[in-house]
């Protein structure tokens, strides 16, 4: 076994141990009342944005086989991670590989632990560009296959093997071509022992000839580094023009693709690209290197929609009157709910969002409270407030950006209040709560608590808002 194979095997072993610890214990985490069934808002004000509610039950295939139905589900939703050298703890490409894990596959998909898409499928908008969750039919296929003894079926039914990019290459390159710009952090010394640490590295951003619009960005690092890097955020700080976080990477996520009609404005600069990383020692001393690649829209074909860099909302820094400068103070065997409200000064279209918590975080949500004139316009039947997204099964080990489908992006008028809630669980019901006997306070370590929301919006002029709203209303009327 060569060094690369050993490193990949070691990372898969770590992931397998983590998976075993997560799935061998009962997960009965205490959800707050605002995510309980009795308080689920179904977005009655559907005229303001497109919505698809809970997926309807689909016909169940009674006797699925690996060669026919199962492998096609695995290729579509699982093998991107579960392949040799991938971050999944085991490959799931062949019958022999999948058969050995059939009971675990059944349990994880039934409980929606895998694939790691942590949205509640019964609340809010369900249309996303990057949705890799399983449909109800796909879940039933995998569950029925395991219940029937995981039959192989006829190998003649097998599709061609899926082809995946090498994990040491850019995942987006086969679709988008060679990156337009690539930046490197340079060597980062990762120690074998000790506590977490957070290197912050600035690399010069050269002045551009003209502003460009970002179409996609991707982060990659070394194989060993993937086992020790919790997350890395790339920030662009320009002397003039928009600055902020552009892309983040964590377990299971290394790129953001904004689409053919959406882009983030990169002004000419100059400035710096900041690599903000979070490492935790894994018992091996090594040298890491982080790279970020940028793909731009063509200079002569700018996107229709200009998205903002990520707007960083600190939910854990809402009320300075709390006992700490940051509010998080979770008692032993207790829970805590926090929120932050963002009142819009101008109309916006919400493009994407991602939440960030640590081990004690279990749920997050985004709710909108409509301004009075919107309620008056749509009449007394309109809801006053609606939950547009509920991350009801948050998992600290996955850092996911949820990118709305183009026709599902919420269009919100000025005066709308966006309420971002987070919930922490420091009880024995949370398998990631390492020691429920201890108080938990704010901190950067994974064993401390933190609560952030990152959102990307497009700011709209009044005429743009009116035009988009009219277009959306016409689209909805055609669906009826």
Model features per residue range: what roles?
Residues 12, 46-49, 61, 248:
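N-terminal non-cleavable signal-anchor helices
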């Amino acid at each position: 076994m060569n060094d690369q194979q050993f490193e990949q095997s070691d990372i898969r072993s770590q992931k397998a141990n983590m998976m075993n610890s997560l799935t061998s214990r009962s997960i009965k985490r205490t959800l707050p009342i605002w995510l309980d069934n009795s308080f689920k808002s179904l977005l009655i004000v559907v005229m303001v944005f497109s919505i698809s509610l809970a997926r309807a039950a689909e016909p169940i295939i009674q006797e699925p086989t690996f060669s026919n139905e199962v492998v096609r589900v695995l290729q579509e939703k699982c093998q991107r991670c579960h392949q040799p050298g991938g971050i999944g703890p085991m490959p799931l490409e062949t019958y022999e590989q999948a058969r050995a894990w059939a009971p675990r596959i059944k349990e994880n998909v039934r409980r929606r632990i895998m694939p790691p898409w942590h949205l509640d499928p019964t609340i809010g908008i369900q249309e996303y560009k990057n949705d890799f969750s399983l449909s109800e039919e796909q879940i039933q296929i995998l569950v029925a296959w395991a219940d029937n003894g995981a039959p192989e079926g006829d190998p003649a039914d097998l599709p061609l093997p899926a082809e995946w990019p090498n994990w040491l290459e850019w995942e987006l390159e086969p679709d988008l071509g060679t990156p337009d710009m690539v930046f490197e952090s340079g060597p980062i010394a990762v120690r074998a022992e000790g506590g977490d640490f957070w290197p912050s590295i600035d690399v010069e951003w050269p002045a551009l000839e003209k502003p460009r619009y970002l179409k996609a960005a991707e982060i990659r690092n070394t194989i060993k580094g993937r086992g020790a890097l919790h997350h890395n955020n790339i920030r662009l700080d320009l002397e003039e023009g928009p600055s902020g976080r552009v892309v983040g990477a964590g377990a299971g996520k290394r790129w953001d693709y904004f689409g053919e009609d959406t882009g983030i404005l990169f002004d000419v600069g100059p400035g710096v690209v900041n690599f903000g990383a979070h490492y935790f020692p894994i018992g091996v001393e090594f040298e890491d290197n982080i790279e970020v690649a940028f793909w731009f829209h063509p200079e002569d074909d700018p996107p229709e929609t200009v998205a903002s860099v990520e707007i960083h909302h600190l939910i854990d820094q809402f009320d300075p009157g709390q006992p700490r400068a940051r509010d998080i103070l979770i008692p032993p065997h207790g829970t805590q709910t926090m929120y932050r409200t963002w009142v819009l000064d101008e109309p916006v279209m919400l493009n994407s969002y991602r939440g960030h918590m640590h081990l004690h975080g279990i749920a997050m949500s985004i709710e909108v409270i409509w301004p009075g004139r919107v309620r008056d316009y749509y009449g007394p039947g309109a809801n006053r407030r609606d939950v547009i997204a509920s991350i009801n099964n948050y998992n600290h080990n996955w850092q996911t950006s949820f990118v709305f489908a183009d026709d599902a992006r919420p269009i919100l008028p000025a005066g709308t209040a966006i309420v971002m809630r987070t919930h922490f669980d420091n009880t024995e019901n949370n398998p990631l709560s390492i020691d429920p006997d201890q108080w938990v306070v704010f901190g950067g370590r994974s064993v401390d608590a933190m609560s952030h929301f990152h959102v990307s919006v497009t700011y709209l002029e009044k005429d743009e808002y009116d035009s988009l709203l009219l277009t959306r209303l016409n689209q909805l009327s055609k669906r009826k």
